[in-house]
Amino acid sequence: MEKLKPKLFSVMKSYTKEQFVKDVIAGIIVAIIALPLSIALALASGVTPEKGIYTAITAGFVISFLGGSRVQIAGPTAAFATIVAGIVAKNGMDGLIIATLLAGVILILMGFLRLGNLIKFIPYTITTGFTSGIAVTIFIGQIKDFMGLTIVSEEPLIETMDKLKAVFQFISTTNLQALLVGVISLLILIVWQYLPGFCKKIPPSLIAVLVGSAMVALLNMNVNTIGDLYEISNKLPTISLPSFSLKTVQNVLPDAFTIAILAAIESLLSCVVADSMVNSRHRSNMELIAQGAGNITSALFGGIPATGAIARTAANVKNGGRTPIAGMVHSVTLLLILVVLMPYAALIPMPTIAAILFMVAYNMCDWRKFVGLCKTAPKSDIIVLVTTFVLTVVFDLVVAIEVGILLAAILFMKRMSDVTEVEGWKYVDDEDDADSLSLRVVPHNTMVYEVSGPLFFGAADKILKITLDEKMNCLVLRMRSVSAIDATAMHNLEQLYTDCKKKNIQIILSHVGEQPMHIMEKSGFLDKVGRENVCAHIDDALERAARLG
């Protein structure tokens, strides 16, 4: 069983000074990368910029300290932006803090209950669908700032479709100076990564922030900056408790579950990616506990939800980080930056922030995979993918995940039902199968039905479609291909037994698997049928039928 022990405690046994130096360098570089991203993601989430830094500092440190991965870097991520903005708009900061606290508790419970491996049962089409949907909502949400639009609205625009409608409605208010800053910032973000040599060591988002801020300040451009719209604080984060009310808890509980699921999916996915880069193996349940503790800490210090960030984790590895020390250094570095440089964040133009978030959205939305799935996946998977994507954009992430999982479950059961068969004996020529049906002689007045596939509630009705001929006195059910049965299937078997009993037909079971045998034993079905009528092999079952006939 996987140990609930932080990776930090394991790696410190063989820690060296050389690795410490590498971890410190990697941590500082990742902090520089995380700074503009944390600010941008905080603004996209509808909160003040320093709250993104608070999150990276508090949650980042705790998750690195307690986490189940050697190199995970945690902080605010784009996946949470839309849901956080919705919570803040509807329930205020107190609602967000309560939702994040509840999500943290849920994550810790998931870890202690060792549910880390259950995340794999969330279909790839759902994660791809909502990730692409989030990317589109972020993109639409940033058009206003990128173009410098002046949107007049009586109420805050929360829904993505309302924001898109407002963009078209107020497109005539485009600020050309803001658009110029946005386009130049976006070009820097795109081109910088292709420049040779030392340029690749400097995060393009940092260059975009410096160039955009310099343009607006030196050219005295009429462009909104962070300082024009938000009051920025460089104060250290302090513990603050929200005003709890039962109504608020009820309102944000669905959001808390969504945050917990998102945090679990994204953090464990990041761990898997990191494992392949450093040839290590993460502890998924310990990682969930750390994610929970990190989110609780972030909420108490005024931050927003956090999870493992794949891009920052990859940057950590590429720059030499190999232990959780790098993640902790990243948080300490951001703390120093908060105190010293945060006032200068007021100079960052909003179009530059929008450009950074455009790139975040583009990197999130792997459209090649999306299109590839639409071309190659089964129809049922395409339905789940497109439905989750559309619901994320049109409604919100909570609805998308709930409906997506429900739809995926229903379609999965439909697929399983389709492969489950209950059919009469067919004589086929199959020389390769020593168990071939064609090699058996069926006794007179005996029916043989082969049951294939799992017998669960979606397919259990096929048992009742067996035609009972009153001229027969034995019904052999060959169950060698039945891997599992559930309560509904067991109920239908009981009904079949009752129908057979009325017509004086004896049921004989052949080759019953371990799980079905256990269920039949517990339900008393074996005693009803008669244990002497439960045979290990089809030959034994046919011989038994011949004796009864």
Predicted regions and their residues:
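Short, contiguous clusters of charged residues that form electrostatic/catalytic patches at enzyme active sites
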Residues: 26, 186, 190, 461, ...
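Short acidic-hydrophobic, aromatic-tinged amphipathic segments that line or gate anion-handling sites
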Residues: 528-544
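The feature marks cytosolic C-terminal regulatory regions of anion transporters and related permeases
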Residues: 363-528, 546-549
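Transmembrane helical cores of multi-pass ion-transport proteins
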Residues: 1-426
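Active-site-adjacent beta-strand anchor residues
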Residues: 74, 509-510, 535
